[in-house]
Amino acid sequence: NDVAMEVETAAEEEEVDDRLSRKAVEDYGEFDPTLELRNFKFPTIELLKDHNANGGGITIDHEELEENKNKIVDTLKNYKIDIAQIKATVGPTVTLYEIIPEAGIRISKIKSLEDDIALSLSALGIRIIAPIPGKGTIGIEVPNKNATMVSMRSVIASPRFQNAEMELPMALGKTISNETFVVDLAKMPHLLMAGATGQGKSVGLNAILTSLLYSKHPAEVKFILVDPKKVELTLFNKIERHYLAKLPDTEDAIITDNTKVINTLNSLCIEMDNRYELLKDAMVRNIKEYNAKFKARKLNPENGHKFLPYIVLVVDEFADLIMTAGKEVEAPIARLAQLARAIGIHLIIATQRPSVNVITGIIKANFPARIAFRVTSKIDSRTILDSQGADQLIGKGDMLFTQGNTLLRLQCAFVDTPEVDRITEFIGSQKAYADAYHLPEYSGEESGTSLDIDVNDRDNLFREAAEVIVIAQQGSASLLQRKLKLG
């Protein structure tokens, strides 16, 4: 069969839409959201102080280590617990002693000796981790006599933070092994911070905001700052036209008035719904894909598409909001916590004690990432972390961080008010947008009665009742019942 056969297939048709976007990218390059403020300079590292006199290194006191090791070994020996080997990891404020007990010793026995070990070391805030997840050891954390301060500068200058391939990198501080700890807020997706007064919550918030200012251009992230204390976040007023978001007709970008919070939260819910509509039109699943598609000029701005910045909502004292506004705040916060993660709205909520009447179960379930500073009792620690341990911290920025699985002990980076002031001054002095980022309009029901009452629709006995009250010069339900022979 020698007849030659010619095979022909039709070429795939090129998608028109794609060609247009490719041509636009070839002609103009990818869309650059930072174009409007292209000369924006990020704050320099020089604006932060180095709080350590000795150049930021950790001073290792070998005598102290040896002494503590001997005390731990002796205490455990008294209770007939032999140790195969022991290893110390020195951190900024805490040293971790990892011990491997001899075979056949029950862990629960060591765990029950927590107070005895604390007594023999005469130290405050000892925590026993038995066993350390991922290692076959038991950890005993002992505070150092001379703690090293972790400055914000050392954390931000670290390669971990500078080379972080993250959407919203937050440098929280240093771990026990003195490594800088950087975590992505976009992956969390929301963060709950709690701890007693004066243990470093507001400093922690400042550290988070500072690390975002050091890593993100104003076009990429916007903050909504809610500050019922009125004084904690006022420094960030200077960067209003760069980084803050607010309702269109309000004066201050930082919300201190609790009634305005309700409008802002509801407006944020509208923003969330609008963003989901845009994502639905663009046929993408999250803000990262959406912005990538928009940068590649595949979405037409005439259809309402625009570059979407991340929005971070920071609430400094959540309990105060719940007391004054209650249910009206709870509903939008719960909605945002459940739904807002895919479209780049993230919540950071700080409160003294996240008990059920402050943070309901629904909201709490959507905050897998928790930070606990020192609290006074085991019950408080359980409320925050669902496990104990936060009651044994030292205070002053010593904290436990969890993302739903293991607890990690960190020393929070310290950032002082003058430093924040210098950073905001540096950013605020540069060319800015015309105004803060505007959230959608939301007009709540005007305060007053929300019942539908018609004034003409009066009771038959209204006039008599009015006369009785005027004559008696006082009014009560029982008085009207007696005089008008009702009920």
Language-model segments: what does each one mean?
Residues N39-P43, I132-T137, E141, P159-R285, ...:
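P-loop NTPase catalytic phosphate-binding loop
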Residues V150-S154, A194-G195, D421-E425:
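Short, charged, solvent-exposed linker or helix-capping segments at domain edges/interfaces
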Residues T402-G487:
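Conserved alpha/beta core segments of nucleic-acid transaction machinery
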Residues K295-N300:
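Conserved helix/coil segment N-terminal to the catalytic DExD/H
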Residues V284-F294:
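Short glycine-rich substrate-engagement loop in P-loop NTPases that contacts/grips substrate
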Residues N1-H190, S381:
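Low-complexity, intrinsically disordered P/S/T-rich segments
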